[in-house]
Amino acid sequence: MSRPLIADIDLDALRRNYCLARDQAPHSRAIAVVKADAYGHGAVACADALRDLAPAFAVACLEEALTLREAGITQPIVLLEGFFDAAELSLIDAHRLWTAVHSDWQIDALLAYRPRQPIPTWLKLDSGMHRLGFAPEAFEARWQRLAAATEHVTDLHLMTHFATADALDAAYFRRQMACIASLRQRLEAPVCLANSPATLAWPEAHGDWNRPGVMLYGSDPLEGANDASRALEPVMTLRSEIIAVRELAEGEAVGYGGRWRASRPSRIGVVAGGYGDGYDRHARDGTPVLVEGQRVPLAGKVSMDMLTVDLTELPEAGIGSPVVLWGEGLPIDEVARHCDTISYTLMTGVLPRVPRRYRNAETG
């Protein structure tokens, strides 16, 4: 019998979340973001599940794009960080990838390269994130340079990223939007602006393309949920089982450092799954875990391969009882808050030794 820990991936839920993102912005095209192995869900399986819905995909780098091409994904694929070396341009050209451009050296390399066909290019505007891209006062000159290079560049788009769209705090977001609107009008530029939170909460940010990412996988990216974000469905359910039960007297401690101590005679369940699988070691005592569909609290520090829960109030639970660490019935965002982290970290942190089991893989 194999270890019971498994990441159960519901591809129908992924499709429904994508359709929700698409329906939030009916006049935009929605790029499905599948970077970081589809946020830990498996990029090939997720892209294949969306191939009849998504007109394009987005990844961080060339290696991720080539993995999709080798798996038979034929839609356009955007490299969100662009290329890291001019030598990558031959593969970008050969595989008909779209590239972001955020630095002068990339522009120089792109215009020095002789492509078989002009390369679709998305020029990154730093509208306030201050991470990648050209400042507003420098953007137009770069745009004009690329727009004139029709033998090298095609489908030139303005692309940016929002720093605070998740907070529903309008002030900084609207400053970013004002910066974008001025350039967009002067350049008559097609745009890709909205990430997941902007797709869900800021219709004015919906452009020619949107980039839903974490919302596709069922995590609510908004600090304050709205009706649309509440409709998202979990795609990954991290499942396990109780593999042992311990009876503790009052005052006995559990786990490394004895952080949790029984305040009464207690039943402790041991779950297969720990930080060596991607469950966050910083989870606090009381972090919710589902056992037999009921919430029980984490009790003690998470170990590499196991964690422990207090089963005292759930006498029917025992060895073999099903466990959900996050997913169906237990939102990953709630677990993340108990770990002082975010859902992105938990999703992408599920390690390779945890098997992925895909449900509803048929497309259509």
UniProtKB/Swiss-Prot annotation:
CDD domains assigned: PLPDE_III_AR_proteobact
Source organism, top-level taxon: Bacteria
Keywords: Isomerase, Pyridoxal phosphate
Catalytic activity, as annotated: L-alanine = D-alanine
Cofactor entry: pyridoxal 5'-phosphate
This protein's pathway: Amino-acid biosynthesis; D-alanine biosynthesis; D-alanine from L-alanine: step 1/1
EC annotation from Swiss-Prot or TrEMBL: 5.1.1.1
GO cellular component: cytosol
Any Pfam family matching the protein: Ala_racemase_C
Molecular function via GO: alanine racemase activity; pyridoxal phosphate binding
Residues annotated to bind substrate: R131, M304
PTM sites of type N6-(pyridoxal phosphate)lysine: K35
Sections of the chain in a coiled coil: none
Annotated catalytic residues: K35 (proton acceptor), Y256 (proton acceptor)
GO biological process, any: D-alanine biosynthetic process
Similarity comment text for this entry: Belongs to the alanine racemase family.
Full protein name: Alanine racemase
Protein source organism: Chromohalobacter salexigens (strain ATCC BAA-138 / DSM 3043 / CIP 106854 / NCIMB 13768 / 1H11)
